[in-house]
Amino acid sequence: MAINPPVDATQTPEWAALQKHYDELQVEGVSLKKWFAEDAERVEKLSFDAGDLHFDLSKNLIKPETLQLFANLAKAVKLDERTKAMYTGVHINNTEDRAVLHTALRRPVEDEGKYIVDGQDTVKDVRETLDKIYAFADDVRSGKWTGVTGRKIETVVNIGIGGSDLGPVMVYEALKPYADAGISARYISNIDPNDLAEKTKGLDPETTLFIIVSKTFTTLETLTNAREARTWLLEELTANGAIAEGDEAQKAEAIKKHFVAVSTNLEKVEEFGIDPNNAFGFWNWVGGRYSVDSAVGTSLAVVFGPARFEEFLHGFHEIDEYFANTPFEKNVVVLLGMLNVWYRNFFKVASHAVLPYDQYLHRFPAYLQQLTMESNGKSVRWDGTPVTSETGEIFWGEPGTNGQHAFYQLIHQGTQLIPADFIAFVNTPNPTKDGDQDVHELFLGNYFAQTKALAFGKTADEVRAEGTPEEIVPARVFSGNRPTTSIFGVALTPFALGELIALYEHITFVEGTVWGLDSYDQWGVELGKQLAKQITPAISQDDDALAAQDASTQSLIKFYRANREF
């Protein structure tokens, strides 16, 4: 099925209406303090619930009537049609001619037979793969699957890169309180030898299981690390007498007991030494940055168990259904996507902070960097024509309260407008008291205070009233009107985390639809990879390859050659 050209949002009456609205707000003067005072129902009008998550949009630079303008633009760019196309398997990944079906990864078994794409019953295939993963996970967790010496697995080491690493490591860190089988995980991604050296430090080879995650089983970084991990395992097992030196049969058995794969290239998997029966597949309609709930999450199923992984999937599906079935005017996923467009294209902001007030989410901003920036960091629309507006945002952040003592200064008093998402949960798995003070409430006090300070600021008169010397007053004034969205959950459970990830997946899709982007390809990573293959021979031995480089690259390589010590 051919994909229609994107609607040029900037040429629609709905875009013009938003521009007029923006201009009127600038003339009126944007003042959250004033808007709150004038409308006692502002918070109610700008608050939403989706699944277990609560959203407060009232501290954003919008009025309640802005939401209808957002919805109108979403309709104008045919968001509903593109959403239906994505959910039903139309090849909306135009440049790679692929369906985009991460939503199928979390559909319930009752949906088998309902989503046939390219002749494939997607839900049935997903459930069969999950059953295989769950059986494997149960075997590892119970001790039925052991290492080559018969000892229970205690550590799984995931080797992947990009979406094969960022998603699993983020979820592992986020859900650590749910690890209940005495199994921990480590994640190796960087081809830098330091990564593997540090991640294998202190590991017992007899109780370590490696999961190699590469759909094609040809990814340079992943396969390099996999081979190094295989060498490490065999050397360590030989050194401690677990296998006999030079015994190739024992080595082959050790690899089979200590390595499994997430890949569809069974020939390459077998060449590596992994039993192809211990390979878990996924499909070309699953993009890497949308794959944590596929077989890419096998390490998570092992650590947390199949039941928890199912809860995780249910959270995704909750938001999938909400997004697809809620009218745009009340659909907080759509509205948040449009809010990002509002700031990017009308306020001309380029940066978006994600500030989780939960230490377990410390890798969430890094995860969102790939999800959002690899998806929408593009200057060409899905039909090959240039974009007609700014696209993409720089996503970044750190957990509170750490960020408060690092970069919040810029958000509060800098010259840039930086919209920020504040994420927190009512309950903690680690309740603590400092005397009579509940420490989690002390923590959440900062969550509430920061959005209030950013919204309403502090005037010069308020600063003077504190007895501040006049010459210092300007430095202590806070302008306010710094926009934030508060996202509040009951607890950081597997279900809630699935909801949170799906939320941002669909926000990214909404933005990409407005901008006319194929949010599911990533050609920007290719050129550097191609050049690296050409340049690598020049680094140590090939003078002809060196001579073929530009002057700057030659100079850098010569510096390397002159100073290498190993």
Swiss-Prot record:
Annotated catalytic residues = 374 (proton donor), 405, 529
The answer to whether keyword Membrane applies is no
Write out the annotated subcellular location. Answer: Cytoplasm
- What does the similarity note say? Belongs to the GPI family.
Where's it mainly located? cytoplasm
Highest taxon of the lineage = Bacteria
- What's a single GO MF annotation on this record? carbohydrate derivative binding
Q: What EC identifiers does the entry list? A: 5.3.1.9
**Gene3D superfamilies noted in UniProt:** 1.10.1390.10, Glucose-6-phosphate isomerase like protein, domain 1
Matching NCBIfam families, A to Z? PRK00179.1
- Recorded GO CC terms: cytosol
Question: Which keywords, in A-to-Z order, does the entry hold?
Answer: Cytoplasm, Gluconeogenesis, Glycolysis, Isomerase
Which pathway does the record list?
Answer: Carbohydrate biosynthesis; gluconeogenesis; Carbohydrate degradation; glycolysis; D-glyceraldehyde 3-phosphate and glycerone phosphate from D-glucose: step 2/4
Q: Which reaction does it catalyse?
A: alpha-D-glucose 6-phosphate = beta-D-fructose 6-phosphate
Question: What are the recorded Gene Ontology BP terms?
Answer: gluconeogenesis; glucose 6-phosphate metabolic process; glycolytic process
Query: What name does this protein carry?
Result: Glucose-6-phosphate isomerase
What is the annotated role of this protein in its UniProt record? Answer: Catalyzes the reversible isomerization of glucose-6-phosphate to fructose-6-phosphate.
- HAMAP family listed in its UniProt record: G6P_isomerase (MF_00473)
Keyword Isomerase assigned to the entry: answer is yes
